[in-house]
């Protein structure tokens, strides 16, 4: 494969979920220096739920998005800074502030069937001159054909790259292959595509490899898999696999391995791994960032987190409905007569 893969690190955004958005300034700078030294192409920085995600509903961050972005901008020289914006949480005002703080890439994220709400934010990002990405979350919840229709909308608004986003870590390799083929069939040849995997079924790396085989240009991954649920595709593992496949990725594997084990893993207050609870996310097709919220609710109401997560899956809850976790817990408690 002659083309160079674009390596997009998400340790400092999706990884924030794993520690309830409590990265210190020193943490983000240490991680960013290592990633920059390893020559990743971009480093995504924000609260786990994107710009202005710090809230009662999603969890308050140790710092503001702008403080984190500015801290990373101070220490990187190679990588571009990316950020995430969910329309309805972040605004174009927040996007402008992030740009002024140093972000040059924005991923505008919507549920996989709601691309139409991204129009204003994508258009404004293009006006700012940002690398503008459409990010279709929970991509397993619609058909490949419907996903392609939504991707085409984002492209029409000005997005120059569209992501298949397996927020629930629920897809297998055939699911990924079908979605990339559907996107490639309708998008312009010059429009890039990306893959954002979660590891809840231990398929994060495999799904990312299949995406590349189907022509995917950008791969999201994180050091030690640091991310919501069982984490994202572990960056160092994906790079090792890409290296063995003979693919051009441009990063230093050993620097990434050291950063994963020496810097990132020690920060985890709950191991980022496939276990009973995180497996339930992938099995039930639940938004990965529901994990920590569900564990808190389970402890509070004397329930099993797995039962809450499976019920959330049955109800087809999506990102942004974190407030329903307590409702589900109370329903389960009532049904059990406890």
UniProtKB/Swiss-Prot annotation:
Active site residues according to the UniProt entry: 17
Gene Ontology biological process terms in this record: catabolic process; L-leucine biosynthetic process
Binding residue positions for substrate: 13-14, 167, 196, 287
Tell me the superkingdom of the source. Answer: Bacteria
The reaction(s) annotated as catalysed by this protein in its Swiss-Prot or TrEMBL entry are: (S)-4-hydroxy-2-oxopentanoate = acetaldehyde + pyruvate
Q: What is its EC number?
A: 4.1.3.39
What GO molecular-function term can you cite, just one? 4-hydroxy-2-oxovalerate aldolase activity
Q: Which SUPFAM superfamilies match?
A: Aldolase, post-HMGL domain-like
Residue numbers marked as site, Transition state stabilizer: 13
* A Pfam family matched in the record: HMGL-like
* Keywords (A to Z) from UniProt: Aromatic hydrocarbons catabolism, Lyase, Manganese, Metal-binding
Residues that, per the record, bind Mn(2+): 14, 196, 198
Listed CDD domains: DRE_TIM_HOA (cd07943)
Pyruvate carboxyltransferase domain location? 5-257
* Similarity remark: Belongs to the 4-hydroxy-2-oxovalerate aldolase family.
Name of the featured protein: 4-hydroxy-2-oxovalerate aldolase 3
């Amino acid at each position: 494969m002659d083309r160079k893969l674009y390596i997009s690190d998400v340790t400092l955004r999706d990884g924030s979920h794993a520690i309830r958005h409590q990265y210190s300034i020193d943490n983000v700078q240490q991680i960013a220096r290592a990633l920059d030294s390893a020559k990743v192409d971009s480093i995504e920085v924000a609260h786990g739920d994107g710009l202005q995600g710090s809230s009662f509903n999603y969890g308050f961050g140790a710092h503001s998005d702008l403080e984190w972005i500015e801290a990373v901008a101070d220490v990187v020289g190679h990588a571009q800074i990316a950020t995430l914006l969910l329309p309805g949480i972040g605004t174009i005002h927040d996007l402008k502030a992030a740009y002024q703080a140093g972000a040059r890439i924005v991923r505008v994220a919507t549920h996989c069937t709601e691309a139409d709400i991204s129009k204003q934010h994508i258009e404004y990002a293009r006006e700012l001159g940002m690398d503008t990405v459409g990010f279709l979350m929970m991509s397993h919840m619609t058909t490949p054909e419907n996903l392609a229709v939504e991707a085409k909308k984002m492209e029409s608004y000005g997005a120059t790259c569209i992501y298949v986003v397996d927020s629930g870590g629920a897809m297998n390799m055939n699911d990924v292959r079908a979605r990339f083929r559907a996107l490639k069939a309708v998008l312009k040849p010059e429009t890039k595509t990306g893959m954002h995997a979660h590891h809840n079924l231990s398929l994060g790396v495999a799904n990312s490899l299949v995406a590349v085989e189907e022509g995917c240009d950008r791969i999201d991954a994180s050091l030690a898999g640091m991310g919501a649920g069982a984490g994202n595709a572990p960056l160092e593992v994906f790079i090792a696999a890409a290296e063995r496949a003979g693919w051009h990725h441009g990063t230093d594997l050993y620097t990434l391995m050291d950063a994963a084990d020496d810097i990132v893993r020690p920060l985890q207050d709950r191991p980022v791994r496939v276990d009973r609870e995180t497996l339930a996310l992938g099995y039930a097709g639940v938004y990965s960032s529901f994990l920590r919220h569900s564990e808190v609710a389970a402890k509070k109401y004397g329930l099993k987190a797995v039962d809450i997560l499976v019920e959330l899956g049955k109800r087809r809850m999506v990102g942004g409905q974190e407030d329903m976790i307590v409702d589900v817990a109370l329903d389960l408690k009532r049904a059990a007569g406890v």
